[in-house]
Design a protein with these regions (language model features):
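Glycine-rich repeat segments that build the extracellular carbohydrate-interaction surface of secreted
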Residues: 5-9, 30-51, 63-69
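Right-handed parallel beta-helix/beta-spiral solenoid domain characteristic of secreted/periplasmic
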Residues: 50, 62-113, 249-252
Length: 315
């Protein structure tokens, strides 16, 4: 049966019943007693080791942790880190682990630990919606294994490596997020194939970096005013940035080096995107007549090859 537990780090007690009148003090306690379809409602305040939290916070299948989605979690700060043993990347410093069909909504997450990740998603299909991820020492959200998350309407700012990292064979919907002032806005690697739609990415080192043999689909994203590139493609990656029957709709502009840099071994085909043909590098075919096919001279050989620093692949 669906139930709601309430948590207040200032007035609550973990010996309480977790009701609205007698809330728990910690998310940790609420997660211990939560069952499928449980909602955990958080009051404004700071949730950290000093208030009694034990990290990482693992949200069980079918459980929702809810703050305030209307302001993307302003005033509800969850800050901390604990060791999570990943099947694909060994020990990691993590604030939250989300199991299948878990939901995290309307909170602010910070992980100040070395190489710290805000949310870790491994071969599960949770929802991460309308949160703020800021000052994480690696990335806000990391998805790996066979993950298939929904990452929707979040704000990612000033995270050291990436806003969002999608690795291994992960898929998922990454929609309506804002990523700024971080290393890479979104990093996609290995054989990952997520759908990126309606994201706004600006003032990062590079906006979107696609590596390995990743095959993401990009539609209606804006990547602008990044120090290096709007989109960087390396390795054997081959993103879908538009087709005749499904136009890309991506806008790449005002980036420091290139709006679109293809340093991969594949030719990219761009259809229905807004890209300045004078700000591209590598093998790119503009298949719509609105943008002339660039003839770069000399042939662009990126120096140095854009390899992320810090590397978005955890060690």
């Amino acid at each position: 049966m669906a139930q709601t537990f309430y948590v207040n780090p200032a007035s609550g007690s973990d010996t309480n019943a977790g009701s609205q009148q007698a809330p728990f003090k910690t998310i940790t306690q609420a997660l211990k007693v939560a069952t499928i379809d449980t909602k955990i409602q958080l009051a404004d305040g700071n949730y950290n080791a000093s208030s009694g939290e034990v990290f990482p916070l693992t949200v069980p299948s079918g459980v929702t942790v809810l703050g305030n989605e209307t302001n993307t979690g302003k005033g509800i700060l969850i800050e901390g880190s604990g060791t999570y043993l990943s099947r694909t990347f060994a020990a990691q410093n993590v604030t939250f682990v989300l199991l299948d069909k878990a939901e995290l909504r309307g909170v602010t997450v910070t992980n100040l630990a070395s190489r710290g990740s805000g949310v870790w998603i491994e071969s599960t299909a949770p929802t991460v919606a309308n949160n703020t991820f800021t000052n994480c020492k690696r990335e806000g959200v990391f998805a790996t294994g066979e993950a298939n998350p929904i990452i929707l309407g979040n704000l990612f700012s000033e995270n050291a490596a990436n806003g969002i990292a999608i690795a291994k064979n992960s898929k998922g919907q990454i929609q309506g997020n804002t990523c700024f002032k971080t290393g890479f806005g979104i990093a996609i690697s290995d054989t990952a194939s997520p759908i990126l739609r309606d994201n706004k990415i600006y003032e990062n080192r590079s906006g979107i970096v696609i590596s390995g043999s990743a095959r993401p689909l990009l539609r209606n994203n804006v990547s602008e005013n990044n120090t290096d590139d709007g989109i960087t493609v390396i390795g054997t990656a081959l993103p879908d940035i538009g087709s005749t029957n499904n136009l890309g709709g991506n806008t790449l502009r005002n980036n420091g080096k290139f709006d679109l840099q293809n340093a991969s071994s594949n030719k990219l085909v761009s259809i229905g995107n807004k890209i300045d043909a004078s700000k591209v590098a590598g093998s790119i075919e503009f298949a719509d007549s609105s943008v002339p096919t660039p003839t770069p001279t000399p042939t662009p050989t990126p120096t140095p090859t854009p390899t992320p620093t810090p590397t978005p692949t955890p060690t």
